[in-house]
């Protein structure tokens, strides 16, 4: 009931309360109820009850008239009412008979009301509809069938509670009223109210009785609840069991990857040649792959796929010069027969060029006049390759397992917590084409080591096949093991154990740097003590390494007992600055020496310390290492050497030093100083890879640039400073001049001299003015002035509005002999002194546009020179400011290439670089510094407000200093060059378009480029799949043209080349998951050649050559695929003729062009 109704009823029971014959002695304090609105229909009754003290309200002064009245509250109100009635506060005019009748009537009404309440409660308590029951039963069956879920029972219990929790909304009205209850008028009002409640209850009873046929009994529902409980119990049991079993499987799961590879191929050619160079280049400039490619990409050697022939069963390298059709095919080879019965091999095109060794006579009765032509044809007829492999890889799946028990003297607990195990091994039939026999066990392919496929019969590379009489083919099954890694915890501190072949590890730059190829079989243990109390805040770490090499360790001892071992400890005391100490050793032990009694035990021992990281806003790197090498030769002296450097400089994640980013800054960007480099170093001459127990040595990365630097990403060397070479020419005939190779280059020898030096580079911003400078001096480790090289320079820049003015001065003085070319182009060796100054004014009006004017002057050995002969680039600190306003970066490099000079003569796409997506054309600009002046203008497409987004171009005109004669000390600016280049990369609709071009014309030789006019233009288009076109075709094409009119003393000649190609791929061809593609490519060139990689990291390249040859290489490539079943076919032709049209295949394939065809079907099933 609502409190308003009770209040009104109680007030009516007071009827004539105002007619009391006596008033209280003192009026009680009447509380004010704050939530009874004025004008409410019950307000007067509420106020009367409050004034009588029957209702006092809640402690917060509220009445809460809309809130249900509890039995406790009703009891208090009735008790107060009875107390007042007992005290004589009764209505006037009521007789005893009236009071008795009123009491009886109230009792009757109360009894009827109670009876109705009981009936309603019974019906509601058992009121579960059949529909509800059916739905619940269906859900029970679903839960049981699906294995159950905990949420299902909770949902059922909620519905049960909802159906059975219909409590009585009305309390039984009890009115145990004494004889002096109230007046007849109040009783009448109370009766009306009670009658209304009775009518409401009767309506509810009727509704419930009418729907009783749809209800089920409580007993049925209880039975249903029992079934729910049973299902829940079974589901919980099953879930617990499955959870444990699944967790165990996941912890111990191997990823098993069986595969079956089937291939059938036919390949034949009259002479092996390369076709990879026809295909479009990848985005990074590497040669695109195809089904017939051979060879691979190797940054150590510079090898690319275009360096190897692609036909037959052999990966023949292409050969430079006439014997290899100038780098387009493998070489011609002859067997030379001598009268004494011996033979020799001659690699050349014309037997007449062969020079007979002294004392030998050619036997003209054999072969063709003493020469036997070695057949260059390559055949691979109907070869079927079937490979089966089974790989096992945990990929970290072993987790949270425990070790087993063990021990011989005692039994271990077997409770070591293993966090992770990685295993990678497998079984395979046949061998990969690049497998080799690692004879010396150093983990690298060395010259003279046989290929694995050529050694093991039936492994895929030999013609012989093992069969039994039933016709079964037998192939060897090889076990492949890559690594095993275990990670486990000791206490709260993780321990990582790595076990495997060719272990890779790194202690420091000059000690135990074996993170590239690896050192040998063994294991490493790393302990992280970050959770150790007290010292854990310093992040202590300990690493231990142990293994064996089974081969050379650099101390001339091969074969037995060569082991390496080392330990390193490291902490991080402040910021990110780490401090480490280490000890390492490698050598042959006594047992190994016993296998070779002529040798004595030897060892290499090195130890040191290092600091790396940043603290207090300064980045610091420093290392010290000392090494003792005891050779294996008896009585040989122990060699001791040291390496040390301390450097404030920024280091990148790949451990290369970034001298363009300040290592420390003082002040702000407007007024401040930036320190880019500050270093001291001393590397002893004897400190090499043997002394450091490292994979590779610490020699200069390049002989002609950055001589002080050892860092080499091609070999993984991270050491910053080199063990320098002193170059000296040889003089075999004692004529006082250097010996020379056939091409005129100097024959030189190198002697290690170590390095000791100091360097600094800094810059400052002073509002609109920026200044910077650098200085470095280095000698051999002994400090001798004969090997000193010093580089120094300063720069300044003033910028305001859209104008900027830059000036720089650079010097390089080298007493250390340098190999370079003099003004006549002859290679010389000796000391060198270079001076250069430059000034440039730039205007950047916005929209990405720029225009500038410059003057530059270069002096070599005291004489003004056309170029710096490439000498300034042999230092490592030379720097200059960026052009434009708002960019005061003091960047390494003299920016000599900014104004050099259009199209180059070397490229890797065959047409001047315009079809190489990795070339931004400025790559064609030489880094040589010239004596010149000129103007240049252009547009930067990456500018935020660029006039044309993604369009880059520049044009320029320059006058170049030319000496009067090659040896003259005077000259003038009679040389001239006009140049330009452009590049536009843009997505146009569904097509990705790249348009590039360059040109230059000069009347004088510029470094390696002769006088003349050259230019190149290229277009590459690749479309997305055309979704609304049948077969969803995808088109791609390229065309590039290069031309050069070279004016040289030996005679002018024109070189030109055209490269073209077009293809289409049908992505949905007839059947789902079926694709087919076809492309045609060609390359035509005149007076162009290809020089293969040099083996020292330099890639092969195309260049101009006055060889009077016309080369034509073209062919068709078709590839189709259904799912993973791939069909490939190619047919290609290589022709090289002289300018009169005579084929240079004379004596080879009867003077006809070389032709090659290949067909391949391959299918790989991954089970």
From Swiss-Prot:
Residue intervals of the SLH domain: 29-92
Disulfide bonds: none
Periplasmic membrane side: 23-254, 404-416, 491-494, 529-540, 572-577, 616-617, 650-670, 767-768, 799-802, 844-848, 941-949, 989-990, 1024-1032, 1067-1073, 1123-1124, 1167
Amino acids binding deinoxanthin: 622
Signal peptide residues on this chain, from the entry's feature table: 1-22
Function: Plays an important role in the structural organization and integrity of the cell envelope, bridging the outer membrane to the peptidoglyan layer. Is a highly abundant molecule in the D.radiodurans cell envelope but is not a fundamental component of the S-layer. Binds the carotenoid deinoxanthin, a strong protective antioxidant specific of this bacterium, and could be part of the first lane of defense against UV radiation, especially under desiccation. Appears to be a nonselective channel.
Protein name stated in the entry: Outer membrane protein SlpA
Gene that produces this protein: slpA
């Amino acid at each position: 009931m609502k409190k308003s109704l009770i209040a009104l009823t109680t007030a009516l029971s007071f009827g004539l309360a105002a007619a009391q014959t006596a008033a209280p002695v003192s009026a009680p304090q009447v509380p004010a109820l704050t939530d009874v609105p004025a004008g409410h229909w019950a307000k007067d009754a509420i106020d009367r009850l409050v004034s009588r003290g029957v209702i006092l309200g809640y402690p917060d002064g509220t009445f809460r008239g809309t809130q249900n009245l509890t039995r406790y509250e009703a009891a208090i109100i009735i008790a107060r009412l009875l107390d007042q009635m007992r005290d004589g506060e009764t209505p006037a005019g009521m007789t005893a008979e009236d009071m008795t009748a009123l009491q009886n009537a109230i009792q009757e009404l109360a009894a009827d009301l109670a009876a109705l309440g009981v009936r309603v409660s019974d019906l509601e308590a058992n009121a579960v509809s059949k529909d509800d029951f059916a739905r619940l039963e269906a859900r029970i069956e679903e839960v049981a069938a699906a294995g159950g879920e905990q949420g299902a029972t909770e949902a059922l219990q909620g519905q049960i509670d909802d159906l059975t929790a219909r409590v009585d909304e009305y309390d039984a009205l009890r009115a145990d009223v004494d004889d002096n209850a109230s007046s007849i008028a109040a009783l009448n009002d109370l009766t009306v109210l009670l009658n209304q409640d009775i009518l409401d209850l009767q309506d509810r009873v009727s509704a419930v009785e009418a729907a009783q046929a749809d209800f089920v009994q409580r007993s049925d529902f209880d039975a249903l609840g029992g079934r729910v409980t049973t299902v829940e119990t079974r589901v919980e049991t099953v879930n617990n069991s499955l959870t444990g079993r699944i967790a165990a499987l996941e912890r111990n799961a191997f990823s098993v990857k069986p595969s079956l590879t089937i291939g059938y191929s036919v390949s034949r050619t009259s002479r092996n040649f390369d076709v990879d160079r026809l295909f479009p280049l990848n985005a990074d400039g590497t040669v695109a792959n195809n089904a017939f490619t051979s060879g691979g990409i190797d940054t150590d050697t510079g090898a690319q796929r275009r360096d190897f022939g692609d036909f037959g069963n052999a990966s023949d390298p292409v050969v430079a010069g006439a014997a290899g059709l100038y780098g387009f095919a493998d070489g011609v080879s002859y067997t030379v027969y001598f009268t004494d019965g011996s033979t020799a091999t001659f690699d050349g095109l014309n037997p007449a060029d062969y020079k007979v060794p002294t004392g030998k006579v050619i036997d003209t009765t054999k072969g063709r006049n003493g020469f036997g032509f070695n057949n260059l044809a390559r055949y691979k007829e109907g070869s079927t390759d079937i490979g089966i492999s089974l790989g096992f890889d945990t990929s970290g799946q072993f987790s949270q397992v425990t070790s087993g028990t063990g021990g011989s003297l005692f039994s271990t607990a077997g409770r070591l917590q293993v966090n992770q195990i990685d295993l990678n091994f497998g079984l395979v039939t046949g061998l990969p084409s690049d497998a080799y026999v690692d004879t010396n066990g150093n983990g690298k392919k060395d010259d003279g080591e046989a290929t694995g496929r050529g050694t093991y019969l039936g492994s895929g590379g030999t013609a012989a096949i093992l069969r039994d009489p039933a016709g079964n083919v037998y192939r060897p099954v090889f076990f492949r093991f890559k690594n095993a890694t275990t990670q486990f915890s000791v206490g709260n501190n993780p321990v990582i154990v790595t076990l495997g072949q060719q272990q890779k590890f790194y202690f420091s730059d000059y000690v135990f740097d074996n993170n590239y190829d690896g050192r040998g079989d063994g294991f490493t243990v790393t302990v992280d003590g970050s959770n150790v109390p007290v010292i854990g805040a310093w992040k202590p770490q300990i690493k231990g390494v142990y293994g064996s090499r089974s081969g050379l360790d650099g101390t001339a001892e091969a074969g037995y007992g060569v082991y390496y071992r080392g330990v390193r400890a490291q902490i991080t005391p402040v910021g990110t600055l780490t401090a480490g100490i280490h000890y390492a050793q490698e050598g042959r032990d006594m047992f190994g020496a016993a296998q070779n009694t002529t040798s004595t035990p030897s060892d290499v021992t090195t130890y040191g310390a290092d600091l790396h990281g940043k603290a207090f806003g300064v980045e610091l790197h420093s290392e010290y290492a000392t090494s003792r090498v005891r050779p294996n030769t008896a009585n040989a002296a122990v060699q001791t050497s040291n390496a040390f450097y301390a450097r404030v400089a920024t280091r990148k994640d790949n451990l290369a030093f970034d001298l363009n980013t300040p290592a420390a800054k003082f002040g702000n960007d407007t007024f401040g100083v930036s320190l880019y480099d500050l270093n001291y170093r001393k590397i002893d001459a004897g400190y090499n890879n043997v002394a450091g127990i490292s994979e590779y040595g610490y020699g200069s990365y390049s002989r002609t640039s950055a001589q002080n630097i050892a860092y080499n990403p091609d070999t993984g060397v991270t050491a910053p400073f080199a063990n320098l070479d002193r170059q000296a020419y040889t003089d075999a005939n004692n004529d006082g001049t250097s010996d020379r190779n056939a091409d005129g280059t100097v024959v030189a020898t190198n002697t290690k001299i170590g390095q000791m030096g100091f360097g600094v580079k800094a810059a400052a911003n002073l509002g609109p003015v920026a200044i910077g400078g650098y200085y470095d001096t280095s000698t051999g480790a002994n400090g001798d002035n004969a090997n000193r090289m010093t580089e120094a320079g300063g720069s300044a820049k003033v910028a305001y509005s859209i104008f900027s003015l830059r000036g720089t001065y650079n010097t390089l003085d080298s007493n250390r002999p340098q190999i370079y070319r003099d003004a006549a182009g002859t290679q010389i060796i000796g000391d060198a002194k270079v001076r250069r100054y430059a000034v440039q004014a730039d205007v950047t009006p916005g929209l990405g546009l720029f225009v500038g004017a410059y003057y530059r002057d270069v002096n070599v050995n005291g004489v003004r020179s056309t170029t710096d002969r490439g000498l300034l680039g042999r230092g490592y600190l030379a720097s200059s400011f960026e052009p434009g306003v708002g960019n005061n970066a003091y960047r390494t490099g003299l920016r000599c290439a900014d104004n050099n000079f259009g199209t180059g003569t070397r490229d890797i796409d065959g047409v001047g670089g315009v079809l190489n997506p990795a070339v931004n054309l400025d790559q064609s600009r030489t880094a040589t510094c010239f004596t010149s002046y000129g103007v240049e203008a252009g547009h930067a497409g990456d500018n935020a407000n660029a006039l044309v987004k993604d369009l880059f171009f520049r044009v320029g005109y320059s006058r170049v200093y030319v000496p009067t004669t090659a040896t003259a000390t005077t000259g003038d600016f009679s040389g001239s060059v006009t140049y330009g280049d452009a590049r536009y990369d843009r997505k146009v609709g569904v097509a990705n378009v790249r348009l590039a071009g360059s040109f230059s014309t000069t009347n004088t030789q510029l470094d390696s480029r002769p006088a003349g006019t050259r230019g190149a233009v290229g277009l590459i288009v690749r479309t997305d799949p055309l979704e609304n076109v049948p077969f969803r075709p995808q088109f791609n094409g390229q065309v590039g043209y290069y031309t050069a009119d070279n004016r040289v003393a030996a005679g002018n000649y024109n070189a030109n080349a055209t490269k073209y190609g077009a293809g289409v791929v049908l992505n949905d061809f007839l059947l789902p998951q079926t694709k087919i593609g076809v492309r045609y490519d060609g390359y035509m060139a005149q007076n162009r050649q290809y020089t293969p990689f040099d083996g020292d990291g330099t890639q092969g390249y195309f260049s101009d050559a006055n060889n009077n040859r016309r080369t034509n290489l073209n062919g068709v490539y078709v590839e189709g695929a259904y799912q993973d079943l791939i069909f490939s076919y190619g047919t290609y032709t290589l022709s090289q003729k002289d300018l009169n049209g005579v084929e240079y295949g004379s004596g080879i394939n009867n003077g006809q062009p070389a032709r090659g065809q290949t067909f391949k079907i391959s299918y790989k099933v991954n089970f």
